[in-house]
């Protein structure tokens, strides 16, 4: 047997998630999937590795993601490839390839790992996971409102809605931003001494990114800077006004943040973020916006679009921070543990357990394997905290009976095999009583 090399560790900023962790992951993902499905969104899957040029064309070369954060490599054929730093570009590329956007509306969702070479810290990792939704082919503010409503519904279902607030802005059209960019540069040039090194680096290449600076001195300076909303084109102004009216009608609270711009170049018009102060410092849990030009920019037919991405690690941190884990107790442990004593009973235990699963597919039933004595089997059962233990010995196997031990009520009974499922259904209040389609 090979010895484990103590020096082999996970890559910095990339984490293992054990069964005790994935319970919460699965719970969150199932809620998000169920909500997206109820709105008619369908899953799409695409590779985690893409051609590097895809991200350079979509995200913008003068961005932190492209300049500093991408995992790039060259394969054996000399192709320049990248581990995806975000999902929208790959989703659009896949949609173009398979003709999803040609005179069609599409509502899609996906989840999976993304990769950015950043300094690891709480809630920010080099491999992180996003749950995202994208809607293609709809130009009006009503689809913007729908995506925001979806996220609001997700927070409520997860029990974190009181710890999140919505921030909105419109960054207008490309021509709007070009006009504003000139005014912003002129203002900043008069205040160079108040700019930090990052702001100075971005001054002429991507000055709008200075608006979301974390530097206190630069933030104070920007209070007197020109505001992007004053330079919006009429179409963007009307679009944003109608979106705000819709959110007011729908009862979704929000704050207009004139400094919200997002870090990727493909955005236009609506941008939004759900933020929290419950993690010590202000953190973005979810971000999104419109990208009406991206499909055409990447070689497809013109298709307006909007999407959002939820950072799953940050959602988990927030749930843990506010101690909202009571929702998981029912999912942590199994319902039934099956103990068997003797070679013949083990075979019959497996047969009976499969019949029970076919009748009660939602039942969490674990069968003990390996022929341990009854003391060891009960020890293993107790680790999983079942409500019911089923016990089958050789006599039970012969007369087709089973011992049902209710650990909660501390009662015990003997049942015929064909009566076990109905009894479990009654004790555990299982409502689903369907049969497997095999």
Curated annotation (Swiss-Prot):
GO terms for biological process: histidyl-tRNA aminoacylation. Belongs to the class-II aminoacyl-tRNA synthetase family. It comes from Blochmanniella pennsylvanica (strain BPEN). The keyword rRNA-binding does not apply. It comes from the Bacteria. It is found in: Cytoplasm. GO terms for molecular function: ATP binding; histidine-tRNA ligase activity. This is Histidine--tRNA ligase. Keywords: Aminoacyl-tRNA synthetase, ATP-binding, Cytoplasm, Ligase, Nucleotide-binding, Protein biosynthesis. SUPFAM superfamilies: Class II aaRS ABD-related, Class II aaRS and biotin synthetases. Coiled coil: none annotated.
């Amino acid at each position: 047997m090979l010895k484990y090399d103590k020096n082999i560790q996970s890559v910095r900023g990339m984490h293992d998630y054990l069964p005790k962790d994935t319970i919460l992951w699965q719970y969150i993902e199932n809620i998000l999937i169920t909500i997206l499905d109820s709105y008619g969104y369908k899953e799409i899957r695409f590779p985690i590795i893409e051609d590097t040029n895809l991200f350079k064309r979509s995200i913008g070369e003068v961005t932190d993601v492209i300049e500093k954060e991408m995992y790039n490599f060259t394969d054996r054929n000399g192709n320049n490839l990248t581990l995806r730093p975000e999902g929208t570009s790959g989703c659009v590329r896949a949609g173009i390839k398979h003709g999803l956007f040609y005179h069609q509306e599409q509502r899609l969702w996906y989840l999976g790992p993304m990769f950015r070479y950043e300094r690891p810290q709480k809630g920010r990792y080099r491999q992180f996971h996003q749950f995202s939704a994208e809607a293609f082919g709809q130009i009006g503010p009503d689809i913007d409102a729908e995506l925001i409503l979806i996220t609001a519904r997700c927070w409520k279902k997860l029990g974190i809605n009181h710890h999140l607030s919505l921030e909105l802005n419109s960054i207008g059209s490309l021509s709007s931003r070009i006009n504003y960019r000139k005014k912003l540069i002129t203002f900043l040039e008069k205040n160079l001494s108040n700019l930090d090194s990052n702001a100075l680096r971005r001054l002429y290449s991507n000055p709008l990114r200075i608006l979301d600076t974390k530097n206190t001195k630069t933030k104070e300076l920007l209070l007197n800077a020109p505001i992007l909303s004053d330079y919006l084109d009429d179409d963007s102004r009307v679009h944003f006004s109608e979106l705000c009216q819709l959110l007011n009608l729908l009862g979704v609270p929000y704050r207009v943040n004139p400094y919200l711009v997002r870090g990727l170049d493909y955005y236009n018009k609506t941008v939004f973020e759900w933020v929290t102060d419950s993690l010590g410092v202000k953190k973005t849990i979810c971000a999104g916006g419109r990208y009406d030009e991206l499909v055409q920019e990447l070689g497809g037919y013109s298709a307006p679009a909007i999407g959002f991405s939820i950072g799953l690690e940050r959602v988990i941190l927030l749930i843990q921070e506010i101690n909202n884990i009571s929702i998981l107790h029912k999912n942590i442990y199994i319902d039934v543990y099956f103990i068997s004593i003797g070679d013949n009973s083990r075979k019959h235990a497996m047969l009976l357990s499969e019949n029970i699963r076919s009748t009660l597919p939602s039942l969490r039933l674990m069968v003990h394997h390996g022929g341990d004595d009854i003391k060891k089997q009960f020890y293993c059962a107790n680790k999983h905290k079942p409500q019911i233990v089923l016990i089958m010995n050789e006599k039970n196997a012969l007369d087709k009976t089973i011992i049902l031990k209710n650990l909660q009520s501390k009662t015990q009974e003997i049942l015929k095999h064909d009566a076990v499922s109905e009894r479990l259904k009654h004790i555990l209040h299982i409502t689903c009583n369907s049969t497997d389609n095999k």
